[in-house]
Amino acid sequence: PNNRRLITIEEGSREFDLVKRDAQGNILNSVVHLLTRPSENPALNINQDFLLERVLRKHPDVIGVGEMRSAAESLSAAESSRTGHTVCTTIHSNSCNSTYRRMMTLAKRKYNMDDSILMQIMVEAYPIIVFTKQLEDRSRKIMEIIEGEDYQDGRLIAHSLYKYEVEDNVTDDRGETR
């Protein structure tokens, strides 16, 4: 929506394209794009964790965090979400359920916290997980959407909201499967 303040944080290059324009090219929404700036000098190093801390002071409606790859990003993005901000991010995983475990194991690399506590943090921070996959025909599909409810006794409690199911594969005249 045009009345939402969006702030994106990305590493290296800008991939999010969230600016909306009208037919005359006027910008309709409020988007601030931030990029990390790695430096060997710690005083000059600007990483995602550093930017996340500062973004919270700007009162965003939505924070877009580029691909989650490190322990600091994993926990700081989750903590930002737990402050009431909507945080959208991407991460490589094999399924909706494994996404929570992947975020937890990333955080575990740096933070000596109990697995169940980290998993509860991730489920609270990211109640909705969307899993996409590239299929054999090279199309990318949303395979599943789940709503994480809780993590108890070493078990994720989640509800499937959507599941893509392939009912039939068809081979066309060129031998391509669709």
Regions found by a protein language model. Name each.
Residues 2-123, 133-134:
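Switch/coupling sub-region of P-loop NTPases
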